[in-house]
Swiss-Prot record:
Annotated active site: R24, N42
Keyword line: Acetylation, Disulfide bond, Glutathionylation, Hydrolase, Phosphoprotein
Name of protein: Acylphosphatase-2
GO MF entries: acylphosphatase activity
Phosphoserine PTM sites in chain numbering: S93
Domain Acylphosphatase-like: 9-99
Catalyzed chemical reaction(s): an acyl phosphate + H2O = a carboxylate + phosphate + H(+)
């Protein structure tokens, strides 16, 4: 992965109709396409949560996708981002679905 610019890390939680609509699978695919690492999982309260890490521009692209696009049959009401920070190195080697 090219590290043009600072590396960023951000936590996210997506609200809406995001479970049972292949949201995690599409999130993993989009993350790999953009070139970010991290993870995604369903929560017990019906949301999807996770973390994204990578070059700032790629993290911003993923944030936009998590806020506006999602999987084809999902309906995103809102996405909360928290704990956004600059990191010195990536903590993950890929993007994965957690269970």
């Amino acid at each position: 992965m090219s590290t043009a610019g600072p590396l960023k890390s951000v936590d996210y939680e997506v609200f809406g109709r995001v479970q049972g609509v292949c949201f995690r699978m599409y999130t993993e695919g989009e993350a790999k396409k953009i070139g970010v690492v991290g993870w995604v999982k369903n929560t017990s309260k019906g949301t999807v949560t996770g973390q994204v890490q990578g070059p700032e521009d790629k993290v911003n692209s993923m944030k936009s996708w998590l806020s506006k696009v999602g999987s084809p049959s999902s309906r995103i009401d809102r996405t909360n981002f928290s704990n956004e920070k600059t990191i010195s190195k990536l903590e993950y080697s890929n993007f994965s679905i957690r269970y």
